[in-house]
């Protein structure tokens, strides 16, 4: 009986990991200086991220993909203005992560499920290149 409960917790906690927000985080981090990215979150503000496509994007895949786009150019460290814009984008993305977490927590019933989901999300964000 306990095993079935744990599987249910794990399944609901995995819901947070498989949201589209992880894709946005990876995309924002790999293309931090691109001007088109600042409109990405603004376009999606009215939509419900939890019920949308829940595909997992590997961090390794995103990193390799962004490097393939500029094979001959060296990636220079961001200038002061680019670093400022990058930090703003990261703050927006993390704010969106908080919103997603709150929406997901509202769908869970018990405090145990909510705690498991928060722990899972914290671990995922700890592995994120944004932090």
Swiss-Prot record:
Coiled-coil positions: none
GO MF term list: syntaxin binding
Listed InterPro entries: Taxilin_fam
Domain of life from the UniProt record: Eukaryota
Disulfide bonds: none
Cross-referenced PANTHER family: GAMMA-TAXILIN, TAXILIN
Assigned protein family: Belongs to the taxilin family.
Protein name as it appears in the record: Putative gamma-taxilin 2
Organism of origin: Pan troglodytes (Chimpanzee)
């Amino acid at each position: 009986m306990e095993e079935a409960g744990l599987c249910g917790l794990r399944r609901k906690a995995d819901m947070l990991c498989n949201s589209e927000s992880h894709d946005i985080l990876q995309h924002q981090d790999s293309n931090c200086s691109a001007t088109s990215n600042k409109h990405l979150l603004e376009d999606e503000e009215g939509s419900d991220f939890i019920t949308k496509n829940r595909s997992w994007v590997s961090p390794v895949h995103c990193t390799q993909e962004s490097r393939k786009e500029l094979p001959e150019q060296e990636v220079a460290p961001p200038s002061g203005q680019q670093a400022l814009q990058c930090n703003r984008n990261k703050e927006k993305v993390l704010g969106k992560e908080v919103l997603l977490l709150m929406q997901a927590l509202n769908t869970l019933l018990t405090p145990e499920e909510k705690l498991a989901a928060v722990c899972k999300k914290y671990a995922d964000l700890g592995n994120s290149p944004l932090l």
